[in-house]
């Protein structure tokens, strides 16, 4: 993509209302633009990051055996009255009345819709286990939206719903999602920690939140320092056996971990999984015939990842004083190609050759006129993993510079060598 033909409205100065670094850089790097409190337009660069995050999530969910669907964002209030949750969300839920005077709502979550989706179709244990997921926009009318996409009112979420015939099978589904989440977040370059947490308005008796450690996090986490030693193994049983809890269930009096072994950190929540048994299937009459011929309530779980929130969380984890330092897996473009002399034919010819030879959908080519300082500052701000710089030696010695954005390391290489490196890697 040529920058001269791209829409990338960056800001030089830090917006006064943006308090945390991810909010500041999201606005300055042209990822988002606010149109109302807690509501944002996703600009082209930010949308590419969202799509890359979605792609990783979709790939790992599909590998787990989950099946993608898409449920409506507008839901009938009757389903929520049936489950008994309609009044639980209070003013957080955006309620709508249509022209037929039917009560509707903009979904803050989809447990009721998911239960309704299968209750008239899935009737036998032979059809289970089943896990359906979607990537869908949701709305919660937060009292104080803040921190940009970290706590917006409209947000993109991956939510999945598992259906099982009994507790043992449901726990297997839960553990599978725990492991899948670890894989998802690690592929994004993150180091996740899964902590036991309160089930809140979703309900149930088993819940884990997934966090990344960050000083700007709103949650306080208590965990055994052995947790991260076991993370590489991705062994769910071992990870779940380690003491790691959110502050809402931590009790200093009963904590089994010695004080010197207990870590206390701030964290940003990026995912949440729940097992809630028949909380929804019972009132909504979602039953199957079990192997013994008896009708039983379906055991359910739900599993959420804040897709749009992850953009902010990743920036919190990957940035420096010049801008974002995207992990390659989620970066909007892999390479930023910078021509320092756009008015000189020899430089333009070399830059165009590099651009046409590389995979153009992975390259943002700065072919604009402007000062060298402005070009470098913009590329550092948007944080593409690699920069290819066409400077003086490109013409005289057939040499260009390759800069690693995260480390700042710069190497001089032959042009063909650089092209081969990025086309093979």
Swiss-Prot record:
Residues that span the membrane, as ranges: none
PROSITE patterns reported in the protein's UniProt record: AA_TRNA_LIGASE_II (PS50862)
CDD domains, per database record: ProRS_anticodon_short (cd00861), ProRS_core_prok (cd00779)
GO BP annotation list: prolyl-tRNA aminoacylation
EC number per UniProt: 6.1.1.15
Keywords assigned: Aminoacyl-tRNA synthetase, ATP-binding, Cytoplasm, Ligase, Nucleotide-binding, Protein biosynthesis
Catalytic activity: tRNA(Pro) + L-proline + ATP = L-prolyl-tRNA(Pro) + AMP + diphosphate
A GO CC term attached to the entry: cytosol
One GO molecular-function entry: ATP binding
Compartments where located: Cytoplasm
Family to which the UniProt record says this protein belongs: Belongs to the class-II aminoacyl-tRNA synthetase family. ProS type 2 subfamily.
Record text on subunit structure and interactions: Homodimer.
Function, in words: Catalyzes the attachment of proline to tRNA(Pro) in a two-step reaction: proline is first activated by ATP to form Pro-AMP and then transferred to the acceptor end of tRNA(Pro).
UniProt-recorded name of the protein: Proline--tRNA ligase
Species per Swiss-Prot/TrEMBL record: Wolbachia sp. subsp. Brugia malayi (strain TRS)
């Amino acid at each position: 993509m040529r920058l001269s033909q791209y829409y990338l409205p960056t800001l030089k100065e830090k917006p006064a209302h943006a308090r945390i670094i991810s909010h500041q850089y999201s606005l300055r790097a042209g990822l988002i633009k606010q149109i109302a409190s807690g509501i944002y337009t996703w600009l082209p660069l930010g949308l590419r990051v969202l799509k890359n995050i979605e792609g990783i999530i979709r790939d790992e969910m599909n590998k787990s055996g989950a099946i993608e669907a898409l449920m409506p964002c507008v839901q009938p209030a009757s389903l929520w009255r049936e489950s008994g949750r309609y009044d639980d969300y209070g003013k957080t839920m955006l309620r709508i009345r249509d022209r037929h005077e039917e009560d509707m709502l903009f979904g803050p979550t989809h447990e009721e819709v998911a239960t309704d989706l299968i209750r008239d179709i899935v009737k036998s244990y032979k059809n289970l286990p089943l896990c359906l997921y979607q990537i869908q926009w949701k709305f919660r009318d937060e009292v104080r939206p803040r921190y940009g996409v970290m706590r917006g009112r409209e947000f993109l979420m991956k939510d999945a719903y598992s259906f099982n015939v009994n507790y043992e099978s449901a726990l297997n589904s839960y553990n599978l999602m725990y492991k899948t989440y670890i894989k998802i977040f690690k592929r994004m370059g993150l180091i996740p920690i899964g902590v036991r947490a309160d089930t809140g308005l979703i309900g149930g008796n088993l819940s884990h939140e997934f966090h990344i450690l960050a000083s700007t996090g709103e949650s306080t986490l208590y965990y055994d320092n052995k947790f991260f030693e076991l993370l590489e193994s991705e062994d769910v049983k071992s990870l779940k056996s380690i003491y790691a809890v959110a502050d809402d269930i931590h009790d200093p009096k009963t904590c089994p971990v010695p004080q010197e072994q207990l870590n206390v950190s701030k964290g940003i929540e990026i995912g949440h999984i729940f097992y809630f048994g028949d909380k929804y299937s019972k009132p909504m009459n979602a039953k199957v015939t079990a192997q013994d011929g008896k009708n039983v309530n379906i055991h359910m779980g739900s599993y959420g990842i804040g897709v749009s929130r992850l953009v902010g969380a990743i920036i919190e984890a990957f940035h420096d004083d010049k801008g974002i330092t995207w992990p390659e897996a989620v970066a909007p473009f892999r390479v930023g190609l910078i021509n320092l002399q756009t008015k000189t034919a020899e430089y333009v010819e070399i830059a165009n050759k590099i651009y046409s030879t590389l995979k153009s959908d992975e390259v943002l080519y700065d072919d604009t006129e402007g000062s060298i300082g402005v070009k470098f500052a913009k590329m550092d701000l948007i944080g593409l993993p690699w920069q290819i710089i066409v400077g003086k030696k490109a013409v005289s010695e057939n040499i260009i510079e390759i800069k690693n954005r995260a480390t700042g390391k710069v190497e001089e290489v032959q042009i063909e060598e650089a092209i081969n490196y990025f086309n093979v890697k």
